[in-house]
Amino acid sequence: MPGIKEIRTKIKSVQNTRKITKAMEMVAASKMRKAQERMRAGRPYATKVREIAAHLMQANPEYGHPYLVEREVKAVGVVLVTTDKGLCGGLNTNISRVTLSKLKEFEQRSIKVQATAFGNKGLGLLTRIGAKLVSQEVQLGDKPDLDRLLGAIKVQLDDYLEGRIDALYVATTRFVNTMRQEPVFLRLLPLSNGLDDPFQSGVETLAKTAEIKSDYSWDYIYEPDAKSVIDDLLQRYVEGLLYQAVAENMASEQSARMVAMKSASDNAKKVIGDLQLVYNKTRQAAITKEISEIVGGAAAV
């Protein structure tokens, strides 16, 4: 059995660790609220762009934008969104598992893959498996910078428009609630005809699409022309989806980190209680032994 001094040192060490995890939990909780606000703030913009773009395409059905054209898939692009740091539970492990499964599926179908990594964890994974990396962006911080994101994704979008890849996917973690984050592997391009939002419920998306289809007899005045407006709107819509993928992952990261640090703090508290019990028993045994020795010595005298 360890001595009293050794147990006291262990208790002090665990107490210090608990202070750290408790502080990290509080920081993550604060960042989580801000990340959720940013995530939700982007949704109205994406919804309105989707509505206008859907209306324009219904009013101009003869125009087939490359982002909407389905073609035989021989090569694809994959955008993997992960965190830069750890200590966020199984967040990165889960999305990595889903991504590896999809990459294996593409390999079995003889489909070429080129990848873009957002976050150090994803970059490390793609490097280890020898994936073809065409762009990367790490150290994104707590707030996604759209210019940096677009700089990294431009290679993939250009390759799609020029026919070097036939589809573009994004692997990220969708924020459901504070306790639940869901790894998802979504097709970014080509867009579906209804311009469904992959980060919102299917019921809401279908309702919005039905609403647009039921009332498109009116029209806008386009400057310079409808084709140019559709091109610009679809480009912005795809950029918005990419931003949303990163924002969802950041909100999921802070939620997962807060939960992980709370669990660590609770476990540390339990360990401290167990060590305190052992300390008390050891101290009591030592006192009892000393008393027995004193009584034994007195009896011998």
Curated annotation (Swiss-Prot):
This is ATP synthase gamma chain. One of its GO terms (molecular function) is proton-transporting ATP synthase activity, rotational mechanism. Produces ATP from ADP in the presence of a proton gradient across the membrane. The gamma chain is believed to be important in regulating ATPase activity and the flow of protons through the CF(0) complex. Belongs to the ATPase gamma chain family. It comes from Bordetella parapertussis (strain 12822 / ATCC BAA-587 / NCTC 13253). It is found in: Cell inner membrane. Keywords: ATP synthesis, Cell inner membrane, Cell membrane, CF(1), Hydrogen ion transport, Ion transport, Membrane, Transport. GO terms for cellular component: plasma membrane; proton-transporting ATP synthase complex. PANTHER family: ATP SYNTHASE GAMMA CHAIN (PTHR11693), ATP SYNTHASE SUBUNIT GAMMA, MITOCHONDRIAL (PTHR11693:SF22).
